[in-house]
Regions:
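Amphipathic alpha-helical and helix-coil boundary elements used as assembly
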Residues: 1-351
Length: 351
């Protein structure tokens, strides 16, 4: 969730993609985090030829290269309501897509806008007396841009069929000898980043074992591709131009943890009751472990007032000059729920 929210791509990479023999030990895989296209590496051969695949060929090649297009929103608009401004707060307005969706009409006239209403991470006091951070547009602007970049990524990609064996997801290559690209495109437009790979490999088994396997596949109603019968191996790639910004899919409503009601222990600065003028308390969530919080002086697992920000306490009745408060005491267990299912907005419902 955090990597999606911060536009960080991730992939599992091989430390050594090719082993010289079956006796060579396999090295550990690497988790790569990439937040900029410039950090994607080129494959070792760098260039791949668009050509037929044949046993007589010296090098593997790409045999089919087809553009895939889909209609996406031409503009992204994000907004949210903030109490301290008493208005609907917008980002920098609708962000128009940089992708050209029509040869006859511009993006503005198409009016395919996608609008989002985002729940804020906090609701501040109208008088600004609760120490809450002032609302701003920076987060909305970032989300607006990220959603727009993802829609542009989905607008056009390419499907390639190849016999290239040493090709890896998260690497880029230059496609050569493609008639359309050679005629009408610059060298930068011939560089493609691999986002997805499906592959087919044929086992090199003795004939009797192969016949038994084929019978088992038939009995299991599994189907093998007729196009692959004459090939020992093949793969299908999803690629985009290297110049297109790559961001992970992020849906603010879907890609977030499910927040359930849970318990927490009341923490204080040493007093029996520790609240601010708003009746808010501080708590330690029961799932926290000391080892996980040593990097920040133990905050979160110290059993004192450094364990959380101020947390609102629900009361039976409240207002200016009337109402009632029942203040939780040190080390008592309270029940925590979350506004709008947002883990950043906890509140105490009772004890």
């Amino acid at each position: 969730r955090l990597m999606r929210e911060e536009s960080i791509n991730w992939l599992i990479d091989e430390a050594s993609y090719i082993v010289s023999s079956n006796k060579q030990s396999i090295e550990a895989q690497k988790l790569r985090l990439v937040d900029d296209n410039a950090q994607f590496k080129a494959i070792e051969r760098r260039s791949i030829r668009y050509h037929r695949s044949n046993a007589t060929e010296q090098y593997d090649s790409i045999t089919s290269f087809i553009a895939q297009r889909s209609l996406q929103p031409t503009a992204i608009h994000v907004q949210r309501w903030q109490a301290d401004s008493l208005s609907q707060e917008d980002a920098s307005g609708p962000v128009l897509s940089s992708h050209k969706h029509s040869a006859n009409r511009d993006n503005e006239s198409l009016s395919l806008e996608q609008a989002w209403s985002i729940s804020p991470a906090w609701i501040s006091d109208l008088k600004g007396e609760d120490q809450a951070t002032k609302s701003g547009n920076s987060q909305l602007d970032k989300l607006n841009t990220q959603l727009n970049q993802y829609q542009a990524l989905q607008s056009k990609y390419f499907t390639a069929h190849s016999s290239v064996r040493d090709i890896q997801v998260g690497y880029w290559f230059q496609l050569s000898d493609h008639p359309e690209l050679e005629k009408n495109h610059s060298s930068d437009d011939k560089e493609f980043l691999i986002l997805n790979k499906h592959y087919y490999n044929q086992n090199n088994l003795p004939k009797d074992l192969k016949d038994q396997l084929e019978k088992l596949l038939t009995l299991s109603h599994w189907e093998t591709s007729k196009d692959s019968e004459q090939e020992r191996q093949a793969n299908e790639l999803m690629v985009v131009r290297r110049s297109i910004t790559v961001v992970p899919e992020y849906d603010p409503l879907q890609h977030r943890p499910v927040a359930h009601v849970q318990r927490a222990k009341v923490t204080t600065d040493g007093e029996e009751i520790h609240v601010d003028e708003w009746g808010r308390i501080k708590v330690r969530f029961l799932f926290t472990r000391t080892d996980d919080h040593s990097h920040d002086g133990g905050a979160g697992s110290n059993d004192n007032d450094t364990d959380s920000a101020w947390v609102d306490v629900l009361t039976p009745w409240a207002g200016e000059g009337y109402g009632a408060r029942f203040l939780p005491r040190k080390d008592e267990l309270v029940v925590i729920d979350f506004f709008d299912g947002n883990i950043d907005r906890p509140f105490v419902t009772g004890r």
